[in-house]
Amino acid sequence: MGIAKQSCDCCRVRRVKCDRNKPCNRCIQRNLNCTYLQPLKKRGPKSIRAGSLKKIAEVQMVSMNNNIMAAPVVCKKVPKNLIDQCLRLRLYHDNLYVIWPMLSYDDLHKLLEEKYDDRCAYWFLVSLSAATLSDLQIEIEYEEGVTFTGEQLCTLCMLSRQFFDDLSNSDIFRIMTYYCLHRCYAQFADTRTSYRLSCEAVGLIIKIAGFHREETYEFLPFGEQQLRRKVYYLLLMTERFYAVYIKCVTSLDATIAPPLPEVVTDPRLSLESFLEVIRVFTIPGKCFYDALATNCVDDSCTEDSLKRIRNELHTTSLDIEPWSYGYIDFLFSRHWVRTLAWKLVLHMKGMRMNFLSNTNNTHIPVEIARDMLGDTFLTPKNLYDVHGPGIPMKALEIANALVDVVNKYDHNMKLEAWNVLYDVSKFVFSLKHCNNKMFDRFSTKCQGALITLPISKPLQLNDNSKDEDDIIP
């Protein structure tokens, strides 16, 4: 009587323990015909089927609309070839690198091959994939019938924060992970979460890593210096953007040198537009953004200093590749900061009436808006969409300034300003990634100024935009 390698057919059907004798004791007791006809099952883990991957993704999703809090879970790793597919399609490299440059395609591919099992590097790669899919508003097919979205990968990262959320560690990949997750939630119009994640990265930059001190970079290789300088200024610009719209004072200042230009053969890797955007954000000092955040203008912000800001940003650089993603970012940031400098004068005590009584001053928003419209004339529509809420909000700032002055003109100049506002409004309302409340406020402001908006088409709103708590005021 031999011993079989698996349970007999009867015990497998009855789901009872089999002693694997021939015949087995269970079959003898029940007077059953003990057979071993079923094929031997292969031992070891099963291959992951498409349905299983889809089920994993569904289980790991969190209902963001209902704010369901899930208990801590141990999530399966995102398959290496899924991340590799995002890299091979060069989605980030071709479309987003010039806007938020961190690592090039070659560096990312090398990181995936060599450090997939490194916890910090792995979660950075997942979060970068999530931010890329979210910014481009696409999903990627992993296997037939199985697709992944940026929201799914972002949610997986947030569910797994215990694996990379170590505030005592200043690993650059951890900082970049928070930045990428911030990009995701900015696309989801979840401003509170987006801002909170950017604050996590800023805290690591200053308190742990010391990236705000130039001496921190002295002994680092050039490549590591460049990466850290890029990330530092990405966070500085993010923080200054939020200072305007959620009224938070800033922590970062231009205390270190920006990254250096790099010699590249591929224009999609050029840092020229990124360096110009840094210049736009840093020509006004830290006090400029803090004044906007607090509605309190100190002595360092004078009419002359604000005029200097407008003048320095009046011209564009000829070195930037025209009509590219980076070019659009630079142009709108330039018009936006010029408008903010104009508006800040209105907040200065005792200046408003005198300032608005000067025709040259009231004509500035019209000039800025006309410049912006000229820049949009030849720009393909798809170049705006990857920037998230930034482009429509900057354009809306310019439209708001027009409303402030449109009734300050005589009949002929008022007609000119109204025509410009007409075109700017049509452009602003044609953009995606808008939230209802922000545009409701703009409409209410126009109604209060007895201005009828020339908008005939419905708003193109992000399905995930939030109308109540998570709105930028």
Swiss-Prot record:
The keyword Heme does not apply. This is Maltose fermentation regulatory protein MAL63. The gene is MAL63. The lineage of its organism: Eukaryota, Fungi, Dikarya, Ascomycota, Saccharomycotina. It is found in: Nucleus. Belongs to the MAL13 family. InterPro entries: Carb_Metab_Trans_Reg, Maltose_ferment_reg_DNA-bd, Zn2-C6_fun-type_DNA-bd_sf, Zn2Cys6_DnaBD. GO terms for cellular component: nucleus. The keyword Nucleus applies. Regulates the coordinate transcription of structural MAL6S (maltase) and MAL6T (maltose permease) genes.
